[in-house]
């Protein structure tokens, strides 16, 4: 109190309510400490019970003979003695002896996974076959990358390879091949040619037949003898240029077509037609009249 009788605000006043709050806080702290002590006692009792259970397991498993060494034990075959010994040292959850739980092994496993990702074949990811250096048709890779002189030609219509169809001649361009030449049979992993190529032989046979027909006298090709009056002769035949021989062929092309039809319809094996003798066709009745 000052001279005027008013209380002094600078000095703390003794309030009974503040002391009651402190007492309450102290009581609460004591209660929490007591609860923690009870929990510790219960944990100690649980530890004692666990030790008793471990000792019973040791007694039950004492008759078994384990052939494994302590170094070879795993989590599935760990004996109860080792767990009981380590329960007091590092706790029952101490896994320090397990080597596969270390960080080094885990990092190695991640490195192994990345190695698998890196070591996968990357042929499909590389540039396409057309853009790789040194890439070419298969027939150029048969002799160690050297160009093959008898590689497949684009003009060959009888080749069954993919290159011939993909890079074939443009429409309107006729295949130019010198008569009498024959392709050499080639074998490759992807390119297979048919061994029997009869196009050249047929071309040679037709050319020789045309030459022989030019030298022989033209004979009329009639299947039957004229029984009635003779019919007027047909219109004059226009000479046309043969695509094979390059010279004009007269009326001799009519028996040539007849012989070609009979040749294709007959059942004969593949042989060299240049060795066959071409005889003119004569009707049976005409032969009989000639004899008379």
UniProtKB/Swiss-Prot annotation:
InterPro entries: Largen/INSYN1. It comes from Bos taurus (Bovine). It is found in: Postsynaptic density. This is Inhibitory synaptic factor 1. Belongs to the INSYN1 family. Residues 23-63 form a coiled coil. Residues 1-25, 122-186, 198-292 are annotated as: Disordered. The gene is INSYN1. GO terms for biological process: inhibitory postsynaptic potential. It comes from the Eukaryota. Residues 198-214 have a biased composition (Acidic residues).
